C-alpha cells in the first residue's frame, strides 16, 4: 500500500474527527475509525489492487485506545522510514466549544471519569500536546461549520492526492415513470423531435445512431446540445469546489427511450473527452419501455 496516501486523523475528542473521516470516505478513501496503532503496519501489508478506485487511506486514532500514546511514535516513524506517505492531521477546538458540543450530543468524554467533563478535556489536551506539536497540520474547528470543514479538508486532499475525483452519473429517464430523486441537474428534452412517431425509429432507442441523428442533427437539436454542454462545462468545476463527492445529471423525455437517451449519451461522451475518469451512464427506463441497449 505504499502507493496510497495515508492520513492519520487524531486530536481532541469532540473536535470533528468523525466528521472529517466522512469527508475522506466520500472522497474515495478507505477509512477506519478507532484503528489500533499497533495493527497499522500489518494492515498496510494487505495487497490492494491499485485499480480498485481507492484514492487513499484514512484512519482515526486517539486516546480511546489505551496504548495510543506509548505506541504511535515508533509506529509512525517506522512507516515513514519504510517509504509510506503518512501525514498526521490534528483536530482541536476551544474548551467552551467542546463543552457545548458534549452538552448537545450528551456523549461521554473518554477521560471524564469521576472528575467531570472539563477535567477530561483539559487532561486530554495535556496528554496530546506532544503529538499536536509533531503533527503535519493542526485544524481548529472552533469556528468552522461542517460545510467549511469539508471545504478545507477537500482542498487539502486535492492538493496532496494523485486525484480526488468527483463521481459523475449521467442518466436518462422517462417522465411517465417519475423524476429521479437523487438528481442534481435535471434537463427536460421533450421539446426535441420525437423519433417515436417515425416508423423506422419507433422500436429503436437513443443509443442507435439513426435515432441520435434524428434527435440532434438539426438546428434545434445541435444548438441545444452545444448550449447544454457549455453549461455542463461551466458547472463541473463549481460543483467540484462546492465540495461535492457525487453529481447526477439526469436527462428526461416522455418515455425515456429516444430523446433522453440520445442526449444523455452525448453528455457522457463529452465528459469522457474532457478526461473525466469517474463518469458512468445509465438508462433507467429502457427496460420499462421494453427496450434494450
UniProtKB/Swiss-Prot annotation:
Sites where the protein binds ATP: 11-18
ATP-binding listed as a keyword: yes
Binding site for GTP: 62-65
GO MF entry, a single one: GTP binding
Domain of life: Bacteria
Function: Displays ATPase and GTPase activities.
Name of the protein: Nucleotide-binding protein Dole_0503
Phylogenetic classification of the source organism: Bacteria, Pseudomonadati, Thermodesulfobacteriota, Desulfobacteria, Desulfobacterales
Amino acid at each position: 500500500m505504499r502507493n496510497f496516501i495515508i492520513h492519520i486523523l487524531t486530536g481532541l475528542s469532540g473536535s470533528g474527527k468523525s466528521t472529517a473521516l466522512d469527508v475522506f470516505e466520500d472522497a474515495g478513501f478507505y477509512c477506519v475509525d478507532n484503528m489500533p496503532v499497533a495493527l497499522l503496519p500489518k494492515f498496510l501489508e494487505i495487497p490492494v489492487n491499485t485499480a480498485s478506485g481507492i484514492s487513499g487511506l484514512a484512519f482515526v486514532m486517539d486516546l480511546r485506545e489505551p496504548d495510543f500514546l506509548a505506541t504511535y511514535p515508533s509506529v509512525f516513524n517506522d512507516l515513514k522510514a519504510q517509504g509510506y506517505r503518512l501525514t498526521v492531521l490534528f483536530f482541536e477546538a476551544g474548551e467552551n466549544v467542546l463543552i457545548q458540543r458534549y452538552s448537545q450530543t450528551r456523549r461521554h468524554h473518554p477521560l471524564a471519569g469521576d472528575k467531570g467533563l472539563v477535567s477530561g478535556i483539559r487532561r486530554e489536551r495535556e496528554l496530546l500536546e506532544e503529538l499536536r506539536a509533531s503533527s503535519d497540520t493542526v485544524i481548529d474547528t472552533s469556528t468552522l461549520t461542517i460545510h467549511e470543514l469539508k471545504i478545507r479538508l477537500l482542498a487539502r486532499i486535492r492538493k496532496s492526492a494523485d486525484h480526488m475525483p468527483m463521481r459523475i452519473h449521467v442518466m436518462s429517464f422517462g417522465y411517465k415513470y417519475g423524476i429521479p430523486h437523487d438528481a442534481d441537474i435535471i434537463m427536460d428534452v421533450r421539446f426535441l423531435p420525437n423519433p417515436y412517431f417515425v416508423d423506422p425509429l419507433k422500436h429503436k432507442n437513443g443509443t442507435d445512431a439513426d435515432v441520435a441523428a434524428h434527435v440532434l442533427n438539426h438546428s434545434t437539436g445541435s444548438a441545444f446540445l452545444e448550449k447544454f454542454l457549455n453549461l455542463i462545462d461551466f458547472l463541473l468545476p463549481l460543483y467540484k469546489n462546492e465540495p461535492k463527492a457525487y453529481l447526477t445529471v439526469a436527462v428526461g423525455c416522455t418515455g425515456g427511450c429516444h430523446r433522453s437517451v440520445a442526449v444523455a449519451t452525448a453528455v457522457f461522451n463529452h465528459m469522457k473527452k474532457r478526461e473525466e475518469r469517474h463518469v458512468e451512464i445509465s438508462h433507467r427506463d429502457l427496460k420499462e419501455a421494453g427496450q434494450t441497449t
